Amino acid sequence: MRWTTGVQHIAGLIAAGNFALLLNNDTSVRPDFLEKLLAETPAGAVSCPKMLFMDPPDEIWFAGGELDPKTGKVKHLGGHKKDGPEFAEKKQVSFITFCCVLLPRAVIEKVGYLDETLFMYCEDVDYCIRLAQAGVPMWFLPDAVIHHKAGGSAGGMLSVYYITRNTLYLTCKGKSAAYAKLKTILPLLTGAARYALTKLLGRKKGRSYGAFRGAVDFWNGKMGRMKG
């Protein structure tokens, strides 16, 4: 599922067990991937499998990640590299994409649900920051493998909108209102300039509008699903 912030649904998932699995609907899984995740996840930790592209099926989409909590920027390790021995090591990481993640019930009860104000994109970044703050380790477990279609809406106007707005939200979270306004000025100005140029050239709304609108909505405190 893409709108993973509706994680009140986790309550139903964990009612009969000790784990919840979040999995995008643009994935295919190997028959034993969940068995391996459950068997190899250390106690009290969150984990994810190795994620390969569907096409080509031997190319890495995600092999663990790195997160800078100050900027909210993340790096997918191994992206677009051919799968091989260098991606076969179980390791602790600072970021896990919620394209597929195994969450123990105890961790959900400790850290809470995903932030619904984000609605879409960056919810995994926020949650990984909270996991780190709570001392919950995150593990990349390469023996478990899934394939991800990827692409989809990535790079489109909506994804740029949510990423722009939600990244500003994350970098300003816990800061003063004055800091948030100051942090938004540059994205507002650059977004406005690029969108104005797009209109001047007679092009349709696209990435430039998404970035501009994302900054505007954050400035105005509009979170959740994009309206209008």
Where are these regions (language model features)?
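Glycine-rich, basic loop-to-helix element that forms the pyrophosphate-binding segment
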Residues: 1-15
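A short, conserved beta-strand element in the Rossmann-like catalytic core
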Residues: 2, 26-29, 52, 119, ...
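Short beta-strand-to-loop acidic/aromatic patch adjacent to the donor-nucleotide binding site
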Residues: 17-28
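Short glycine/serine/threonine-enriched helix-capping/active-site loop
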Residues: 22-23, 47-51, 77, 141-142, ...
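Conserved donor NDP-sugar-binding/catalytic core segment of glycosyltransferases
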Residues: 27-62, 67-69
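Short, flexible, basic/aromatic active-site loop/helix in glycosyltransferases
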Residues: 68-94
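A short, conserved alpha-helix in the catalytic core of glycosyltransferases
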Residues: 94-145
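Non-catalytic, C-terminal membrane-associated alpha-helical segments of glycosyltransferases
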Residues: 158-166, 177-228
